[in-house]
Structure formats: structure tokens, C-alpha cells
């Protein structure tokens, strides 16, 4: 084989390299990958779902499988594309109408567009939703809603003690379970 043919063969074989993550540099957003034969790459970037005006962050896991895509067959110039199912993790679902993220701690994000359902599951911790000055925080044992005004429309049932630190204003009657109102006279 001539030198030119050998170089061409090497470059072609390095265009796409199946590999797994062996090191992660979070600050630099780079990984080192290995093809399992003893070869380990230099530090290379990993592919993100979005990196423009909308940006996405998910660092590849150690041993996560993927492919190193190398322009002109030069692995040092490559980009690691994570996310091939294999020994490091099986697929989290198998339905075409569901998008799922599952995490090692038992948490998950599941959107089922057929059912029009989005489920966020955490084994413990906090979920916070913020819009400007309004905020809803859900923790293991409490739900806190903070806003300039909160409107509930429809029947409301409260099972348990109700504590109020401010005034109660009603546009209609307040009736207890016996049918009495606060201004009931005998």
C-alpha cells in the first residue's frame, strides 16, 4: 500500500469512530473518548442539542456511548455525539409519541403528546416555576405560591385547617356546614 493510499485509508476509518466517554471536563465542555482498542482521543467538544439563541446543557456521562465525527478523518478536530444506547444505559421508553428523560436518582421528565400530558417526577427536592415576580415552589411537603394576585376559578375544596393572616373578603355569603352565616341572629 502506498503512503497516499494508507493516509486515505486512515482518514476514512477516522471519519466516524464508535466510542465511549473516558473523561469529562465540565468547565471546558469537552470529553476524551476511547474506541475500546487502547486508543484515546485528545480533548474534543461534545455535540449539544442547541447552542445558539436557545442553548441546551447536558454533560455526557462517563462510559456513555456515542460517535466521534471527525472532519477529514482527523480525530483531534472531531466532535463527540453522545447518546447511543448500550452498556451505559438502555432506552428509557419505546413509544413513538413520548419524549422521556430518566435520571439515576429516579427523577424523570415525560411528555406524552397523544395523552397531552407532561409529568415531572422527583424522588425528593424542589420544583420551582418563576415568571417575573410570580413563583410556585413545590417541595417534599409544601406548595408555596407567591404573586401580586392569585385567582382560583371554580369550586375549591380544602381538607385540613385553614389559617389566614389577612382579612377575608367575600362577595357572597359564608355558610358553615350547619347552614349558618356569620351574621346569623337568634
Which role does the model predict for each range below?
Residues 111, 118-121, 126-130, 134-138, ...:
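Low-complexity, small-hydrophobic/phenylalanine-enriched stretches
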Residues 16, 58, 151, 171, ...:
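Generic structural microfeature
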Residues 46, 80-81, 88, 100, ...:
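Alpha-helix boundary/interfacial micro-motifs
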Residues 2-4, 8, 159-160, 164-186:
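C-terminal, disordered and strongly charge-biased linear tails with low hydrophobicity
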Residues 1-117:
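Exposed beta-strand/loop interface patches that mediate assembly or binding
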Amino acid at each position: 500500500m502506498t503512503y497516499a493510499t494508507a493516509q486515505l485509508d486512515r482518514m476514512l476509518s477516522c471519519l466516524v469512530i464508535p466510542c465511549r466517554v473516558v473523561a469529562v471536563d465540565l468547565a471546558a465542555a469537552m470529553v476524551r473518548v476511547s474506541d475500546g482498542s487502547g486508543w484515546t482521543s485528545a480533548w474534543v467538544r461534545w455535540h449539544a442539542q442547541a447552542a445558539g439563541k436557545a442553548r441546551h446543557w447536558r454533560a455526557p456521562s462517563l462510559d456513555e456511548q456515542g460517535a466521534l465525527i471527525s472532519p477529514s478523518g482527523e480525530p483531534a478536530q472531531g466532535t463527540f455525539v453522545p447518546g447511543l444506547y448500550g452498556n451505559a444505559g438502555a432506552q428509557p421508553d419505546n413509544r413513538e409519541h413520548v419524549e422521556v428523560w430518566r435520571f439515576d436518582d429516579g427523577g424523570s421528565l415525560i411528555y406524552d403528546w397523544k395523552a397531552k400530558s407532561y409529568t415531572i417526577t422527583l424522588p425528593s427536592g424542589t420544583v420551582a416555576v418563576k415568571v417575573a415576580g410570580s413563583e410556585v415552589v413545590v417541595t417534599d411537603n409544601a406548595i408555596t405560591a407567591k404573586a401580586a394576585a392569585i385567582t382560583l376559578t371554580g369550586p375549591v375544596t380544602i381538607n385540613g385547617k385553614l389559617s389566614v393572616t389577612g382579612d377575608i373578603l367575600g362577595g357572597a355569603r359564608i355558610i358553615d356546614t350547619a347552614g349558618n352565616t356569620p351574621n346569623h341572629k337568634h
